[in-house]
């Protein structure tokens, strides 16, 4: 109370629940996503289906800001330059990001790039790509939407994924 006044601290993992119950994607703001290139390609493909848009409660993501799936931290200076250019040219008012360890090197810099809300949804990016394990906290009732194009899923870095509650859109 002494530090926060009348504001109670909110547990950081609340963003997982807000992602899992689609609350974040139903916000009336322009939403962009920042994540691994391979996963964002899948999300883009899924967003072409009205059924998936309805599931999320979102017509579209305004921006897909991609980072390399692997070795994203190897050249932090380059990564920040690339991110800054894309973020400054984006329409988004809110960015949902799942960037793994890279977050440690970029989150403090992002507020200087553009006045927006940046929410680290972590494995929520995997959920949006239809790749979340239903045993992960908060995602027990999440339905993984997928397309049958197997090539789209080649070389995707999976985080403890076990196929469950999968629904194919095509």
Place the predicted regions along the sequence by residue.
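Short, flexible loop segments at the rims of nucleotide/cofactor-binding pockets, characterized by
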Residues: 7-12, 70-77, 97
């Amino acid at each position: 109370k002494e530090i926060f006044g009348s504001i109670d601290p909110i547990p950081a993992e609340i963003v997982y629940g807000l992602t899992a119950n689609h609350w974040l994607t139903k916000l009336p703001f322009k939403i962009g996503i920042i994540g691994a290139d391979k996963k964002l390609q899948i999300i883009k493909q899924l967003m072409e289906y009205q059924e998936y848009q309805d599931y999320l409660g979102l017509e579209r993501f305004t921006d897909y800001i991609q980072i390399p799936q692997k070795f994203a931290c190897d050249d932090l200076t380059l990564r920040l330059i690339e991110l800054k250019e894309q973020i400054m040219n984006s329409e988004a008012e809110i960015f949902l990001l799942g960037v793994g360890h890279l977050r440690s090197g970029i989150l403090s810099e992002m507020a200087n790039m553009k006045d927006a809300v940046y929410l680290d949804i972590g494995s929520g990016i995997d959920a949006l790509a239809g790749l979340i394990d239903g045993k992960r906290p908060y995602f027990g009732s999440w339905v993984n939407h997928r397309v049958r194009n197997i090539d789209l899923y080649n070389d995707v870095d999976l985080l403890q994924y076990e196929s469950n509650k999968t629904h194919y859109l095509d």
